[in-house]
């Protein structure tokens, strides 16, 4: 049962990025933890680390985070009690901000359309590889999350920068970037050149409407055509938008951590590459088959193809009329 008292959660959440709770160091993954094979390139996502720093530095953000999780828990409980009526699919308008130095970084309109199509398939549960969801997890799959994406605009800007960091410089025109378009009402995605080992990162819903709110993705991992293997199926955007809609990494960013979702099996840490099912690890003395094919793990694009029903509920709570990202709703 993945549920923590909020005060305990906040203390854990604001701890150092690599603390991993000393009491959990005895938990075992043994030889069953999936690691990269055939490629040294691993998925790297800085969203949780950036969030921790932001929460440490801003009492206002901590308050918004507290309110966000309280509303999410209420939405989940109300849904169980039949108090939430279906209000249909939410369509989110997207602005893609392209910062390019080379022609390959100036991604084409067709590649942007391709990425939007991947998001709509993955969040609509119509992705062709959903057929690969193991029988044991079929009853837990989200299916249609009832969130769709529509390209509203593309903004392009030439730059001389050869690399970008996670300091949000790409989000300010004053630092050579592109200012966000109405971040309360649009999902802004910045596509930039090299970010080193980071494929992308995102802000969480407590940052809704702030100047830096949105998703950043390295051009090499945006879309499909021309993207770099093994992250060339558009799933970096699927993963990062999951953070934007309040999903944590499936391992809870700690050894046997908590992702605040009850139907995702607890796991010792991230999985990489293309694991073979079933993949087991042990947490709390219990051996479990892990949901490594979840979009919020670190496996290669070809190995991830599902959200869980619990994750769907968390995302729906954020875009609901009372949610932190209600401003994104299009009717």
Spans of features found by a protein language model:
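Metzincin-family zinc-dependent endopeptidase catalytic domain
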Residues: 114-278
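Propeptide-to-catalytic entry region of secreted or membrane-anchored zinc metalloproteases
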Residues: 27-183, 320, 325, 331
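Short, histidine-centered active-site or binding-site loop motifs used for metal coordination
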Residues: 96-100, 221, 300
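Stable alpha-helical elements in mature extracytoplasmic
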Residues: 108-115, 233-237, 308-314, 324
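Sec-dependent signal peptide recognition
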Residues: 2-7
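C-terminal motif of bacterial Sec signal peptides marking the signal peptidase cleavage site
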Residues: 13-16
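Bacterial signal peptide processing site
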Residues: 18-21
């Amino acid at each position: 049962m993945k549920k923590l008292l909020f005060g305990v959660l906040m203390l854990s959440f604001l701890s150092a990025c690599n603390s991993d709770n000393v009491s959990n160091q005895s938990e075992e993954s043994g030889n069953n933890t999936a690691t990269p094979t055939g490629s040294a390139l691993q998925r790297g996502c800085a969203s949780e680390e950036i969030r921790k720093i932001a929460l440490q530095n801003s009492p206002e953000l901590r308050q918004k985070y507290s309110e966000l999780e309280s509303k999410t828990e209420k939405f989940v409980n109300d849904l169980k009690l039949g108090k939430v009526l279906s209000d249909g699919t939410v369509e989110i308008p997207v602005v893609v901000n392209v910062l390019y130095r080379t022609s390959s970084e100036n991604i084409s309109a067709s590649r942007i359309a391709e990425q939007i199509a991947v998001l709509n398939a993955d969040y609509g549960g119509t992705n062709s590889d959903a057929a690969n969801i193991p029988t044991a997890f079929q009853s837990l799959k989200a299916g249609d999350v009832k969130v769709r994406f529509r390209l509203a605009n593309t903004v392009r800007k030439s730059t001389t920068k050869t690399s970008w960091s996670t300091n949000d410089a790409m989000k300010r025109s004053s630092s050579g970037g592109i200012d966000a378009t109405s971040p309360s009402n649009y999902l802004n995605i910045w596509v930039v050149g090299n970010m080193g080992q980071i494929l992308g990162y995102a802000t969480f819903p407590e940052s809704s409407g702030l100047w830096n709110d949105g998703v950043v993705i390295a051009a090499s991992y945006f879309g499909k055509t021309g993207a770099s293997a093994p992250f060339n199926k558009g799933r970096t955007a699927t993963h990062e938008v999951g953070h934007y809609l309040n999903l944590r990494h499936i391992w809870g960013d700690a050894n046997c951590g908590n992702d605040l979702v009850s139907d995702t099996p607890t796991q010792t840490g991230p999985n990489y590459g293309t694991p073979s099912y079933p993949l087991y690890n042990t947490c709390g003395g219990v051996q479990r088959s892990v949901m490594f094919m979840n979009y919020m793990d670190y496996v290669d694009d070809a190995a991830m193809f599902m959200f869980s029903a619990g994750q769907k509920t968390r995302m729906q709570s954020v875009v609901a009329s009372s949610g932190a990202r209600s401003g994104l709703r299009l009717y």
